[in-house]
C-alpha cells in the first residue's frame, strides 16, 4: 500500500514538472518570437506569466518536501526527487531569461546587422531545441537522449562567441557603442544562459535515470 501511495506521488510530481517545462518552453519561444516581430503584446504576456512559472516551482518544491517527509523513498526514488527539484530550479531560471528577452523586445531600437541577427536567431533556435530535447528525455525516460542533449550546448557557446565578435566589429565600424549593440550582447548572454540551464536539466535527467551525474555515481 505504501509503495502504491509513493508511486502515485511520484507520478504527480512528474506531471507537475512537465506542466512547468511546457510553460517555460512556451515563454522562451514566445519571447524570441516577440523579439523578432517587435510584438509588445506577446512580450508583455511573457513578463506577466513569469509569476506563474515561479508559483509552479514552489508547488513542486512543496510536493518534494511532502514526499520526503511522509514516504519512505528508496535510493532510486531519491535520485528522481532530487533531480526534479534541480530541474524545476533550472526551469525557473530559464523563465527568468525569457522575461529578460521579452523586456529587450520592448526596448530594442533600430535594426541589427544581418550577420548579428542571424547568429542571434540561431542561438534562439538552438536554445529552444536543447530545452525541448532535455524535457523529452525526461518524458521518455531516455538516458541516452539526455546524454546526447548535454553536448548540444557547445553549439550555443560557439554562437555566443560569434555574437561577441559581431558586436566588436559593429562598435569598430560605428566608432561608438550603439545601444542596440549592447542589447544584442545582452540577448546573446541570456540565450547562452538558457543553454547552460537546459544542459543542467539534461544532466539531472541522466542522474534521475542512472544515478550518474557528470560521469560520477552519486548517492
Which residues are covered by each model-predicted region?
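Cytosolic, long alpha-helical scaffolding segments
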Residues: 1-219
